[in-house]
Amino acid sequence: MGACVIVTNTNISSGLESNTTGITAFSMPTWQLALWATAYLALVLVAVTGNATVTWIILAHQRMRTVTNYFIVNLALADLCMAAFNAAFNFVYASHNIWYFGRAFCYFQNLFPITAMFVSIYSMTAIAIDRYMAIVHPFQPRLSAPSTKAVIGGIWLVALALAFPQCFYSTITEDEGATKCVVAWPEDSRDKSLLLYHLVVIVLIYLLPLTVMFVAYSIIGLTLWRRAVPRHQAHGANLRHLQAKKKFVKTMVLVVVTFAICWLPYHLYFILGSFQEDIYCHKFIQQVYLALFWLAMSSTMYNPIIYCCLNRRFRSGFRLAFRCCPWVTPTEEDKLELTHTPSFSLRVNRCHTKEILFMAGDTVPSEATNGQAGGPQDRESVELSSLPGCRAGPSILAKASS
């Protein structure tokens, strides 16, 4: 392996995977360290502030509390935790190659941030499945609030189980007077255990979820873009509802693609290191790792920006959240976006059935009346005149109850 590496299972604090080949304690110029510190500090501030604001927007406003939005809250909390605990502490460890934070936090660092990473990707998968059921199978029963909370709890339990092996084998070692937080895999099968764990993790928290989301959003896209709105409703609620669903799909696809791009180089880095350990002898590898780790962690700060750019309600929520800033001036319309319950249209037919063209309380980040659609009550509206023996009657406008 060469004298350039530490022959221990040094975890240079990936927060997800361990570099068990070890890394030399390369020093860097002060100016370079300052640049990296600024980049990581900006990442943490944007990610924590943005995801905390997203959580507040949804939980503080009754209109926003929908099934899909609960998964968005779960995603935001996971990203917030990953940025706060993973990015900040691991940057210090990776840049100094010394563990300053004690044994207990070593165990914590190899459990909770990794769990948050798993929760993040599984929350995106849950959103994709929820939208698939709402749009492709609109008449199937939707998740209730208790069921949604149970699914979220299950996501955290599965994530904890997947993160536990790295926590279980974590320990503190001393190397030439420097304290290390390492993952000490069983010595008799160290290389095999490491590679197997890397591959299992990549499959379970990257390839498999991305495949599920790709299939789900592909079917959703085909369903929505093939759906035609009847000519007499071309300017009505049905059209707005359909456009809102399309916008939601575009938003979530952008979220997923951003996540995939940010994490792919990081996973490839560790796979390559499992086969070619000598790459860790190169002087530039510390800079490569810091760059790839920053790119991976930056995935935690993009979602709030995407929501704010593509969704009217989130823009209103951000204006309200930052109204103390002199350059932010929320309007009365911003308050109504988050508190006012819109009207919806009912179409009554001879069969005494109702067609709900637009329902209040639809989810974000899809948009309908003023840009929103797709919540727990979100069902595909049905053209009643197409049902046997039924003919649509006059449209009746009714106010939705809050």
Swiss-Prot record:
Transmembrane domains' residue ranges: 33-56, 70-90, 108-129, 150-170, 197-218, 252-272, 291-310
UniProt KW Zinc keyword: no
Lipid positions (S-palmitoyl cysteine): C324
Pfam families in the cross-refs: 7tm_1 (PF00001)
SUPFAM superfamilies hit by this protein: Family A G protein-coupled receptor-like
Protein name, UniProt field: Substance-K receptor
Disulfide bridge map: C106-C181
Its membrane topology: Multi-pass membrane protein
Record's subcellular location: Cell membrane
Biological process annotations from GO: positive regulation of flagellated sperm motility; regulation of uterine smooth muscle contraction
Biological role: This is a receptor for the tachykinin neuropeptide substance K (neurokinin A). It is associated with G proteins that activate a phosphatidylinositol-calcium second messenger system.
Gene3D superfamilies on file: Rhodopsin 7-helix transmembrane proteins
Record region (Disordered): 365-402
UniProt organism field: Cavia porcellus (Guinea pig)
Gene: TACR2
Principal localisation: membrane
CDD domains according to UniProt: 7tmA_SKR_NK2R
Cytoplasmic side: 57-69, 130-149, 219-251, 311-402
Glycosylation site residues: N11, N19
